[in-house]
Amino acid sequence: MFPSRKFDFVPIAAPNFALIVSGMSEPRSYLVCASQRSGSTLLVESLRATTVAGNPEEFFQYLPSTSRSPQPRQWFESVTDETVLSLLAPLEPGTADTRTAEQWRDQLLSVGRTPNGVWGGKLMWNQVPLVLDRAAGLPDRSGDDLRSALGDILDRDLAFIHVYRRDVVAQAVSMWRAVQTQVWRDDATPPAPHDGAEYHADGIAHLVRILRDQDVQWRNWFETEGLDHIDISFDDLVAAPQATAAKVLVELGLDADLAPPPPLKRQSDGRSKEWVERYRSEAAANGLPL
């Protein structure tokens, strides 16, 4: 008689027979590549709402030294103009992230994945150094460049989704208001007409340079690496958010019919439009970037 033994059973995901019968491939994990105020939050929240397209978050924004995303003044570290800096909240201390690189990766993968195995996340170009630093602590590295780092952290078969905004001035105005108010998410509440944010051409100009450079860097990276990617413009996303999300779902091998109505509302208002027009006029007169 065999001795009694306790067995630990590990659950294994069942094969998706619908995909097998239809000839479709398994759905792909993905990374949204963007810059701040480009509309990427609307896209990832739409994908999250499907419950099958990962739980995309901006996982790479948190600084290991503080466990916080960059604070308003950290966006302006090279700026010495006190009329700009005085409009931004002072730095607040944080708590150092003591997780190992492997612990950080494992948690990131667990949180970002839906039960069907699809992982989703979002990366801004200014966060690339954080990705490289985190990946440097992983064992058995495949290389030290960004593509290797993403492969070592995430997956070798990632789909890349590039979200961009043609009107960088409007994007910078949106970010300039956000760094002052520290309200980054759109919701059902209309923006307050007097939210405490103040117009400053040099503050906006600083962000125009940053945001324009971020998009240039993404485009250069895709070209240099020869990476196929999905291009999503802010204009298309805002004009037809549900249809745009459906397009992305198809590209990921998921059901387009799962695309939800837009879960967020735009924060832009008449005040932002006034600032955009004012900045364009002052930029033309004073040689500020457009």
Task: List the model feature ranges, each with a label.
Residues S40, Q61, N126, V168-V169, ...:
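Surface-exposed, flexible loop/turn segments at secondary-structure boundaries
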Residues F2-P115, R266-R271, W275:
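PAPS-dependent sulfotransferase catalytic core
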Residues E26-R28, P115-G117, R156-L158, L227-D228:
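Short coil/turn segments at beta-strand junctions that form active-site/ligand-binding loops
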Residues G120-R219, Q242-D257:
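PAPS-dependent sulfotransferase catalytic domain
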Residues S110-G112, D152-I153, N220-E225:
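Short, conserved catalytic or adaptor-binding loops enriched in Gly and charged residues
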Residues S25, S35-Q36, R113, Q127, ...:
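Aromatic-acidic/polar surface patches that form glycan- and anion
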Residues Y30, G54, W119-G121, A159-V163, ...:
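Hydrophobic/aromatic beta-strand patches that form the interior of the parallel beta-sheet core
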Residues L63-Q71, D187-A205, R219-L290:
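The conserved 3'-phosphoadenosine-5'-phosphosulfate
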